[in-house]
Regions:
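Cytosolic, long alpha-helical scaffolding segments
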Residues: 1-120
Length: 120
């Protein structure tokens, strides 16, 4: 989905300002940390550390909180004409897609957690 949004953005001639790019980069960083946490859990399935699982859930909450903050700020920025409405739409599509990646990551961690608890 992300490549589709980027292609549509480019085809429509929509431009992002530096703030939007910075926020997208920030969200990518959060998701990257989440992937790292998931990989850490996956790397030691025989001895899953509960602290690593908890850290994954904390990262997911951070992703959700950032998404909520960016969504609220997006409405304010569009209303304040800080950037165009269409820019805000594509921006939020990208942020939502990245947040969904966080959801997929936590689904993997949920499965590992459930297996870990069933073995105890």
């Amino acid at each position: 989905a992300l490549p589709i949004f980027l292609l549509r953005k480019q085809e429509s001639g929509v431009h992002f300002n530096d703030e939007i790019y910075s926020n997208i980069d920030l969200m990518f960083g959060y998701v990257e940390k989440s992937v790292g946490g998931m990989l850490k859990v996956l790397s030691n399935l025989e001895n899953v550390d509960e602290h690593d699982i908890i850290a994954c859930y904390n990262r997911e909450r951070e992703i959700n909180n950032l998404r909520n903050q960016l969504r609220t700020a997006n409405v304010v920025n569009i209303n304040g004409r800080h950037y165009e409405y269409q820019s805000g739409i594509y921006y939020m599509d990208i942020i939502s897609t990245l947040e969904k990646a966080g959801d997929f990551i936590i689904n993997v961690v949920d499965t590992i957690r459930d297996e870990f608890r069933n073995k105890k």
